Amino acid sequence: CRTDPTAAKHKGISILIVDTRDPGYSWTPIILSDGAHHTNATYYNDVRVPADMLVGEENGGWKLITTQLNHERVGLGPAGRIAGIYDQVHTWASKPGSDGVTPIEQDAVKRLLGQIKSIWRINELLNWQVAASGETIAVADAAATKVFSTERLQEVGRLAEEIVGGYGNPADSETAELLVWLDKMTKRNLVITFGGGVNEVMREMIAASGLRVPRVTR
């Protein structure tokens, strides 16, 4: 909340912990496109918070917010998300289908799996770069990791569905289950493109903070 109304817009902000038992606090669930419920919209009506619920320094909230956002952006871009899709599809493709054909023996399947694995490895390098930076993560590095991973995840989902949908038989129970899982992952992974800040804003942050390009005038 703003604790110094006279300060500049990024100053005078403090973080306070709100007791959710306060009668002025309420929430409603946010249901995602895949039907999952991971987060909520919260509301504060005449909520009063004791001063001893302050987190960190008074008027020092913006630094905490930006630090948390950097960690959130990195957390939204782990290589493990892509690795999980690759492992599931690679395992499926390595088994003979109901027609006796093993999908991974097809050149097109090998090529598509290779594309997924190359994206996975690049994402790993970005993760390692951020991990090597220590406690202080550069804004541009966190944003770049998030943009690359969340957008490449959409591509990985399409490639995976192309493999399973194109070289599998949906009448086969294992293939059908994998297609349902991939569909859920595709919908769920779309949401993270705007978690921690939409990617259009992330690109501006990369340009301004990482490349020192003048900020866009608004």
Q: What do the PLM-derived regions correspond to, one by one?
A:
Residues C1-T28:
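A short core secondary-structure module
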Residues D4-T6, R21-P23, L32, R48-V49, ...:
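Short, glycine-/Ser/Thr-/acidic-enriched flexible segments
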Residues A8-G12, G56-E57, V198:
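Short glycine/proline-enriched turns and hinge-like loops at secondary-structure junctions
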Residues S94, S98-I104, K110, W120-T175:
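C-terminal helix-coil-helix/basic helical segment that borders enzyme active sites and/or dimer interfaces
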